[in-house]
């Protein structure tokens, strides 16, 4: 009988512990989310480009942002860099799109940094003189065809760019969801290269 009581007490204790677990990993990983529109843009958007032109994506935002309240993102995160991603695809046939890749050396990196593989890994770098996070990179358009670009390689969002701070290990990680204009209902910027 005594053994049965111990089992019941243990079972109740475990049930109590499990029922009070916090399943919100954001607090554990120090993640915070804010919404600030128009931090990333497609420069001079047009539906037609010519071979040899570059498609420029840019971002320039201050360290103090307004998400209903002013937040100093540099002081809060300690991050010198914020990252986001985008994908450029070329239409192979009516139902098949192929990711377009170029060597990193072919990217026209004006501000910030970028790495290209199956997507462009865009890095907005903090400019200590201006107090701005900056990114401006041109992607070379090397062949004719129908193209599309989308933001967020690992995202389901269709109208926002997700910027993430590269914060030191002990600091807050800030995720900024930024509405972007110029995309279709499926989240693509469509264009043709002649």
Identify the function of each model-found stretch:
Residues 34-194:
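First exposed extracellular module after export/assembly in secreted or surface-exposed proteins
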